[in-house]
Amino acid sequence: METSERLVILTTPSRNDGVRLHIERAVQTHGKNQDLLLKQLPHMETAIETLKGGTGDIVAMSALDWQKYDVQGLSIVGLLSRKEPTWVLVSDDKPEYLEQGALVLCEHELLQRQMKRMRPDLRLERIEETVQRLKAEKDVAELDEEDIWPWVEEQRLQGNLDGFIVPRAIHAGHRMKGRRHTLGLQRDQTESNRERFIPPPLYGFTILVSRQGFPKASVREMLDPSAELAYRLEASLMESIDPKLRPIVGAYIEQRKISTFLKKATEDGDETLLNTLVNPNKKRAVYKSGPRVEMLIETLTSDGTVTAACERIVQPENSQMGLVTLLKEFMDLLSVMTTDHEATKRNIPGMPDSFMEPKPRLMDLSLIHISEPTRPY
C-alpha cells in the first residue's frame, strides 16, 4: 500500500438503494493502494451531520438522498461507476409468460403504466392494497422497513402474489431466491418484441459527498467521469420537468463507446441510428470517433396505451445542447399530444375529409391522480 493520509468514508446500513454494497466493494478494491476506512453510522442524517461537524471525509449516498436531505455546505466530489438502474420483475415466469390476469405488486406509478403497456391484462397492486387484501395490517405494521420486501417475497412464495416489481438493488440486497427478470432499456427482439422500460431517473448512482474544498485528486481513482456527466444531465433534465409529471416520466442518460451503438444498430438494421453516427464533414461515410451520450425520455397514459417518447445521441462535448434540444422536443410533443384538435376548414390535397374534423387529444394527463407510495424505496 502506498503511504497516504487515511480517508474515512461514512456510510449507513443498507437502505434498499445499493449504495452500501457499492461503496463497500469500492473501498475493498481501492483500499489495496490507499488507506481507506469505511465507518458505518445508523442513519443518513447522522452521517451528514457527522461530516459537517468535521469528523470523516466523505459520505456515500444515492442521488435521491442528495435531493432529500439538508446538504448545505457540502459538495459532490464525484461518482462511482453507475450500477444497473433498471427494475426487475421477481416471479417464476418472464413477464410475457405470466398467466392471464396475474396479480403483480408494483409501487411505482411509471412502472405500473409500462407494465400495462406490455400486459394490459395484468392486475397491478400497491403494497397497501396487498396488505388490505390479505388482512395483514397488524403483521406489516410490526415490520421494520428492511423487512417489508422479504415479507412480500414470502407472499409470492405462498401464492398470494404472482410477482412483484422492484429496483434491482432491492432484489440483490435481500438475496431473494425468486428469479428476477430485467425490465430492460432495450427492446428485446427475442421476447415477442418486448417493449423497453425506460426507468425512473437517478437510480443506480452512488455519490461521494464531502465538505466544500475537499481535494478531489485524493479519490480520483475511485471516480467515474462518465457517471458524473450522466448524473448531472439526468438531474438537470428532471429539474426542468413539471413536478406533477416527474412520477410518470422515465429518463435515462448514459455515455457509451461508439462500437456499442454500431453493434446494436447493425443487429437491428437501424439505418437512422447508423446515419447519426456518421461524420457529416466527410464525403465518405466515416463514423465520428469517440464515445456518445445517449438520452432517453418517455411518459405514458394511465392505461399504458399511448406513449410520448424522445431520444438523442450526441457527442459528450455537445451533451448540454443535446439535453436542451431533447427537452424542447419532448415538451413540444407533449403539448401536441395533450391538446384537443379543433376542426379546420383547410383542405389539404390528398388528405381525407376526416382530416378536417375535430379530434380529441391523444394523451390525457390532466385526469391523472398519482398516489404516493406507502413505503419509501
Language-model segment annotations:
Residues 94-98, 111, 213-219:
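Short helix-loop capping/hinge motifs at secondary-structure junctions, enriched
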Residues 59, 103-106, 164:
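Short, hydrophobic beta-strand segments that form beta-sheet elements in well-ordered domains
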Residues 47-88:
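Short beta-strand-centered segments that line the small-molecule binding cleft or hinge
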Residues 1-49, 117-371:
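Small-molecule-sensing regulatory modules
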Residues 89-104, 118, 122:
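Flexible hinge/capping segments at coil-to-helix
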Residues 107-117:
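Secondary-structure junction motif
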Residues 65-66, 110-111, 170-171:
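Alpha-helix capping/helix-boundary segments
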Residues 372-377:
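Short "domain-exit" segments at the C-terminal end of structured domains
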